[in-house]
Amino acid sequence: MKRLFAFVVLFLTLLAGPALAQQCLHGTNESAEQAARKRDALTATRTINNIQANQPGAAKGQYFRQEELAGAPFAARLRESPSETVRRISLNPGTDILPNWKLTLDVTRTGYWFMIKDTSDPCGFAYISNQAGVIFQGEPIR
């Protein structure tokens, strides 16, 4: 009886395993819609770096905090952009930078770093960058 019970538990575990596996939105099986969302988020990532690099304080290593981005001179021109993606970017505190993409920005004495994370992706895909302007893509180790 113990052997049968162990077999049933093992069998059910093997059946449930794939059902419990996370379906990542970005990766080898990424849909065209998710790839487009990811491109839009990359545009937003580049936009944050441009706002930070093209403001007067950048030469002295002074950068905008997240709550200051919406008031940046470069940010004021986003709504006039020919790019629909750029026009959809929201820099208002407490809002998604793009639908289901969250901006986290931290300014230090010597620079800044930020992450734009896909909040709809169970695997946590994100773009990460800093004052050097290099953009990384990442997700948590699984």
Question: For each of these PLM feature ranges, what is it?
Answer:
Residues 25-35, 50-122, 129, 139-141:
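Extracellular/periplasmic head regions of type IV pilus-like filament subunits
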Residues 17-21:
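Sec/Tat signal peptide C-region and signal peptidase I cleavage site
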Residues 34-45:
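Membrane-proximal amphipathic alpha-helices
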Residues 1-4:
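Positively charged n-region of N-terminal signal peptides that target proteins for export
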Residues 6-16:
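Bacterial N-terminal signal peptides
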